[in-house]
Amino acid sequence: MLPDSEGQKLKTFLLGTGTTLDPSLDPTGNSNFSMATTSDSSTIWTALPASQPGDKDIPTVDLAAISEAYGSTSSTTSLTSSVTSQYQYNSYPQYAMYTSANPANYYQQVTANLRAGTTAFPYSLTTPSYYGSYPVDYTSAAAAYQNPYYTNLRGGTAAPYYNPLNATTAAAYASVASSVLGTDAVNLGTSSDGSTGVPSTVTSFSLKEKKPKVSKKKKTGSCSPGDETYARVFIWDIDDIAVISRNYLASVTHTNEFYARAANSVSHLMERIALNNFADVNEFLEGDITNIEDAVVDETTMDSGPIDNLRGLDVMRRVAPKYSAFRQFYTENSTKNDVAGFKQEQNGFNFELLERVGFGAREATELYQSAIQLQTLPNFGQRWPCAQRCMDLVVEKSKLSAEKYANVVLSNDGLVLGAAQLMISGLNSSVPVENIYSISKQGKESVFEKIQSRFGKKCSFICITSGDTANSAKRLNIPVWPLNSNTDLDKLYSALDNFLLGG
């Protein structure tokens, strides 16, 4: 607290000569006082409230003197009115209030607001203004009033999502939608609820997906079983019945030079038969298929991707006509073998076949001598006739009996070379080309499953083999007839004649 003399000096310095002290001023600062200037007899405040405490940072007398010196009604601005008016239009008060000629006005206003007993909050909380009014409390009535509709910009009224149509317009839209979308009836609604404006009758119609039409060309030349029901199918391994596979002939050539020339002659004959319809060996090896039925390519009107297997679509389109020609060649040769005079002699080659593949008389004679030489090998001389007896019996019983039976052959050398081995050994008359399956690119179990799928689940299967094919058959619960010697073929013939082919 400043002494009385210092306060008097400060007041005299600030007021100058134009200021007079009110006689009611109490130098002690404990009583009420009032200050006035010569320019205006009014004051900012005349007395402090009786309940206002006196322990402030600045003495009452000094604060009153400062207020009297700088306070005048002509320069006083209400902070509440100015700030409130500015806040309604802008985010901040006017900048001119802080840069006025008399800076003390700002502090005077703040001091007045702080000293006032009840000061109104300058920033009024007004209700935010939006494009629509919302109820204060969320009640059912208020919620029902708020309709989720779009505002009609032109008319200013709320319009529903679905505008009700009159009977004529709805019928027109229904007829157009029915003709375009292919639906039987389309109801867009003709009446609406008065409270909400939503059409009371709105029937949704289902859109039918239009799938692209695919016209498939029917497979030609197919000799699949179709609707025929087979009672039993016998699966043969070509290595056990023809005994002229490439692996077998290669092993004979390396182990015994005496049979090397005869084995090479037979291998050359197989290649000549295959090349009768194909350009080279790589072509039918690259385009090898599991079954001759797979060579038929469906012609579609829409583009199709590559076939999901081991060959591409381009390869199949190139070799499909050649497989068709090979099928015809195999069928014609099998038919001639059944005609009297063209039946292949046992332990020899079909000379008609040799002539068709381009062999002359000299080459045919050499092949005949090679066949006689190879007959001295174990299981080679007697295997062909024994296997042919069994397979021919299956075909004969199938023709005479109401039940159907079939022979199926598995080839490790591919479809074309497997068919060539059957033609060389004379077994092609008992095995249609459609019943030859190649296991060179697919596993044996996959081929077995394909055979089962083709002939049906009601058909029983018997596998005649001596190799590891028996293991694959057992895993699929297919009975196996072990074949280790020619004696096993004789036993099989007896079982076929008495039990397995209907007695």
UniProtKB/Swiss-Prot annotation:
GO terms for biological process, alphabetical: cell differentiation; egg-laying behavior; embryonic morphogenesis; locomotion; mesodermal cell fate specification; negative regulation of apoptotic process; negative regulation of extrinsic apoptotic signaling pathway in absence of ligand; nematode larval development
Required cofactor names: Mg(2+)
Gene3D superfamilies hit by this protein: 3.40.50.12350
A molecular function GO annotation: transcription coactivator activity
Entry annotation: catalytic residues: 237, 239
Observed phenotype of the null mutant: RNAi-mediated knockdown results in severe lethal arrest at an early larval stage. The pharyngeal structure is disorganized and the anterior tip is thinner. The phenotype is more severe in a pax-6 (ju468) mutant background. RNAi-mediated knockdown in L1 larvae causes a decrease in resistance to heat or oxidative stresses characterized by a reduced lifespan, reduced heat shock protein hsp-16.2 expression and increased reactive oxygen species (ROS) production.
The protein's Enzyme Commission number: 3.1.3.48
UniProt catalytic activity: O-phospho-L-tyrosyl-[protein] + H2O = L-tyrosyl-[protein] + phosphate
Keywords attached to this entry: Developmental protein, Hydrolase, Magnesium, Metal-binding, Nucleus, Protein phosphatase, Transcription, Transcription regulation
Function statement: Tyrosine protein phosphatase. Acts probably as a transcription regulator in the embryonic and postembryonic development of several tissues including pharynx, vulva and gonads. Required for the development of anterior tissues during late embryogenesis. Together with ceh-34, required to specify the coelomocyte fate in embryonic and postembryonic precursors. In the anterior part of the embryo, prevents apoptosis in cells that are not fated to die. Together with ceh-34 activates proapoptotic factor egl-1 expression to promote motor neuron M4 sister cell apoptosis.
Subunit structure: Interacts (via C-terminus) with ceh-34 (via N-terminus).
Family: Belongs to the HAD-like hydrolase superfamily. EYA family.
Name of protein: Protein phosphatase eya-1
Species for this entry: Caenorhabditis elegans
